Every structure is written in C-alpha cells, then in structure tokens.
Curated annotation (Swiss-Prot):
Homodimer. It comes from the Bacteria. It comes from Thermotoga sp. (strain RQ2). This is Acetate kinase. Belongs to the acetokinase family. The keyword Protein biosynthesis does not apply. It is found in: Cytoplasm. Its EC number is 2.7.2.1. It catalyses: acetate + ATP = acetyl phosphate + ADP. ATP binds at K14, H207, I208, G209, N210, G211, D283, M284, R285, G331, V332, G333, E334, N335. Keywords: ATP-binding, Cytoplasm, Kinase, Magnesium, Metal-binding, Nucleotide-binding, Transferase. Pathway: Metabolic intermediate biosynthesis; acetyl-CoA biosynthesis; acetyl-CoA from acetate: step 1/2. Mg(2+) binds at N7, E386.
Amino acid sequence: MRVLVINSGSSSIKYQLIEMDGEKVLCKGIAERIGIEGSRLVHRVNDEKYVIERELPDHEEALKLILNTLVDEKLGVIKDLKEIDAVGHRVVHGGERFKESVLVDEEVLKAIEEVSPLAPLHNPANLMGIKAAMKLLPGVPNVVVFDTAFHQTIPQKAYLYAIPYEYYEKHRIRRYGFHGTSHRYVSKRAAEILGKKLEELKIITCHIGNGASVAAVKYGKCVDTSMGFTPLEGLVMGTRSGDLDPAIPFFIMEKEGISPQEMYDILNKKSGVYGLSKGFSSDMRDIEEAALKGDEWCKLILDIYHYRIAKYIGAYAAAMNGVDAIVFTAGVGENSPITREDVCSYLEFLGVKLDKQKNEETIRGKEGIISTLDSRVKVLVVPTNEELMIARDTKEIVEKIGR
C-alpha cells in the first residue's frame, strides 16, 4: 500500500509518499508560500533536491503541482496517480469528539469545521488540504489524524481549569494538548527500544522544538500534558511564553494601551526565547552558540528554558507516582546534548544518570538510550516521525474497510 501523507498549513503543504511495505519514504517535499509571491515546490527523492518555481494561488493548485510531480517522468516516483492507495492528513484540533484517527466523510468534515474556532490558524488550512485531495484524487480514501486525539485519555482532574464551569459547558474550554501524534510515536518507539511493553511503562515524553510540550504517558495512555486549551501553555518556547500569571496580559494591555488581539500576538509570536533575547533569535541553536561564547544573558535564557522543562518532568513523575523512562524528541530534543544534560542534572533525585559520551553522540537523527547502565530511570533520544504514524493509522483504517 502507498500512502500520501499531507500536512496542510496556512501557506504551505508538506507531503511524503510512503510505501507501507517496509515503510520506505519514496519522496517528500513542501509547497511553500501558497497565495504569496515567490511560491515554489521543493521536492526531494533520496538525496536529490529539486526546486520548481511556480505561482500557487491556492491549496488546490499546490496539491495539483505535487501530484503532477509525483508522476513526472524525471522527478516522479510513481507512473500513475492510481498507485496512491490512500491519503493521510494531519489535523491539529479534533476537540472532544475525536479520540482516534478516522476515515473522512461529510460528517467528519463538518465536525472539523465546527471545532475550527479552537484552532483558527490551523484547522481551516487542514480542511483546505483535505478538500483538495478529495477533489483531485476521487475515490481514494482519506484519513484524518488529530494532534489532540492522543491526549483525550487525560482525566477530568487534569483537563478542567478552575474557572466558572459554565465556560466549559458553553465553549468547551479545557486542556486539549497538542503534538499528540509525536508523543504517541516516541512513547511507542521508546518501549520497543527498551524491549518492554508500553502498557507496563511510565514514560515522560519531551517534544522540544520551536513549539514544545511534555506528556505523561502511563501504561500507554496520556494522563497529562503541558500544552492546554491552546499551544500557548506550558514550556518556554521559540516565540511563545508558556506558563505565566493570567493577570500579566491584562496589566500589559492597560499599561501599553494594546488590544486583546495584539496581546495574543505578543504572547504567541514575540515572547518565549525570542522575547527574552530582546529579539535576537527564536532559535535555540543561536542562543546556545552565544552562551558558549560567553554571553551571560544567553546563558540565563538557557537556564530559564531548561528549568521549565525539568519542572514539568518532576511534576509528571509525581502525577504518575514514578517514571521508568524520559524521552527527548523534536528539533532541540534530538539535537541538543546541552539541553538534555542540563535538564537531567535536575533529575538526579529520581535516579537519572546520563552517559556523557552517548548523550553527545546521539544527534542528527540517531536514536538510543543515553543514560548509564545503572541509571534507575532510562533516558532516550527518539527522532519523531509524525508522518509515519499518520501513514500507519491510514493503512490500518483503510484495510479495516477493505479498500
């Protein structure tokens, strides 16, 4: 079975074509700057990279170009679009309705639309990708995989906020959590690496990229996660503030005379590492580099960043009454030995012991255990693979309906 995985953003479509027999990526790429001047397609086959400059006014045109490229004589990896057996889509928000991945039908499309106010930047764009695929590949089954679904096992004590209950009843304001597909993939893979059953382990997964979240996975089910009603809660991130006193935005709005929308943009796009560094960078690589060169302010930013992650890990060890493994993933988690070492230095009371050499060697796509043999809690690095998880779900659902 061949599955086309699509991640449709507001001005981009990322894609991978995966041959499920052997789980081999045949090609991948991104159509970027959709609806903006300078749009193009970056297409990769093995180690070859091809760039096609083309005006892409909308998502349908972008997907058309992607599909034409897949069957192109020179750049293509298949001869006919009929070789695509199914399409798997990433959808950011499934609300409370979707606890697992589902086959797309009219009812599902309507439900995704209904929860769009909870993810106004993402869901409408995800929907455009789904509708374009349904139009351009008629008769091919489409499956949606939700970022929020894995967190739907979180109990009420962890997902309800202490605000008037009527707001939950009226507006479904609660903790939803995000990065669910990544947390699900790395917790499953960590159990495989450890040679244990996922259902027997208490795992804390740390998805540390430009956006970042921690999840407590107890016996295969998520019981808490750091992102909340939106991806703004929790850790200090590239441009997002993470946790802060809810009175602060009101105070700033009053003092600076700014609107709620402006305040929201500041917390989402101008805060976090970017805000702390006074606009120097939102990229942790730049902050690390400056800190290593002796920049005291960047050293402090690293401390703030690492401290917050360690605090959440400690909290989740308490929430699960113990922890067997801690997993680092995503851009920073997979590639920053400094972050992993510093975070783990707070966790020695749990019995965490890091193997310095393994920690420094496990970067750039490598996976493995980076704790010492006598470490009570195992620490792992697992490169995330959300696309593969989406493809696996798609295959499973399509096979069930006998397509």
